[in-house]
Regions:
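Sequence/structural signature of beta-propeller domains
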Residues: 1-332
Length: 332
């Protein structure tokens, strides 16, 4: 989600503010790139791993160490990319055609979870066939499987009051754009954003209503673990919820799209603590939170926070930050 027309945008920053608009009318300007860091954080290399796609958003590292990149358009695809840039990226139409925001993988149950960034978006899962990802196999082929949509017992708003049961229903036409094939009894989520699977739990964010949701895949329940509209001090500090990442200890790191341009830590007990804030880039958004293998460095982007070619910052080129993190996250 970093606009700027590739090399041309970096050469002529004045073009960056209209990058997203032009991509709407001229698809294929998107893609994904890789940065290679040394153990000390020094950048050693950079290269493209995906190109000629449109509005690439979040993604995920697969258990077999490739990268999945999501296209955020109504006919969007998920693409599998070689992180070394050797093999050509390949589209994965079996995972559905919709405004893909993010994807998470439960390798134990062999299930993919996906968010849809639309005001009337749904929450999806994709279950590969036994032949596509056999038990004991190191990876899925991602060619054949079942696309399903989340259904909640009663009103999905009941999840504000505690866990409610959910089930899955098969997509009506899995090979067509899902905006044209809505199932009326499936749960509606206002702007699906980041999603993360860990320890039988699936967390995902919805930006339209500033909520963080949790699926308990063992109990088959869903609940809201954060809601800006009902949050009280000191926890009412998180808005514009967007990309999410989890630590091995169960904390959810939520990046803000706008809001106060913060990364906020949501602890398992429900407590919220701001980790960092970017000042002076209110028209940007934070995304792409990732950690170095030793856990000592955190990387994240400000998608439109860079020079805009008009003597200032904001609505400009993307920026990448490195944060040297403490041994423990702040808890006060």
């Amino acid at each position: 989600e970093i606009p700027g027309f590739g090399t041309l945008g970096f050469t002529v920053p004045e073009l960056a503010p209209v990058g997203n608009l032009l991509e709407t009318f001229s698809p294929g300007l998107g893609g994904a790139s890789a940065l290679v860091f040394g153990p000390d954080g020094t950048i050693e290399d950079s290269y493209r791993i995906l190109q000629n796609t449109t509005f690439n958003c979040a993604g995920v590292i697969t258990p077999w160490k490739t990268w999945l990149s999501c296209e955020e358009i109504p006919t969007g695809l998920v693409w599998e990319c070689d992180p070394f840039g050797i093999q050509a990226a390949r589209p994965l139409p079996a995972l559905g055609l919709f405004s893909h925001e993010a994807v998470a993988i439960d390798s134990e149950r062999r299930v993919f979870y996906m968010t849809e960034d639309m005001p009337d978006g749904r929450f999806y899962r994709w279950v590969p066939t036994a032949g596509d990802w056999p038990a004991g196999a190191p990876r899925a082929n991602m060619n054949q499987g079942l696309l399903q949509v989340l259904k909640v017992e009663g009103d999905v708003a009941n999840a504000l009051n505690g866990p409610v049961r959910y089930s899955w229903v098969n997509a009506a036409n899995p090979n067509a754009p899902q905006t044209e094939n809505r199932l009326p009894d499936t749960a509606v989520f206002d702007g699906g954003e980041g999603v993360w699977y860990q320890n039988d739990r699936v967390f995902f964010a919805t930006k339209g209503d500033d909520r963080l949701w949790m699926l308990n895949t063992t109990a088959q329940t869903i609940e809201v673990v954060y809601d800006m509209a009902t949050a009280t001090a000191p926890n009412n500090i998180l808005s514009g919820v967007d990309n999410i990442t989890m630590t091995p200890f169960g904390e959810v790191l939520v990046a803000e799209d706008g809001g106060s341009m913060q990364v906020v830590v949501v602890y398992p007990d429900g407590k919220l603590v701001p980790l960092l804030q970017i000042v002076g880039q209110d028209q940007s958004e934070i995304a792409g939170i990732a950690f170095s293998p030793d856990g000592k460095r955190m990387y994240f982007t400000s998608d439109r926070g860079g020079p805009n070619g008009q003597g200032g910052y904001g609505l400009g080129l993307g920026m990448l930050y490195e944060l040297m993190i403490p041994d423990t996250l702040p808890n006060a």
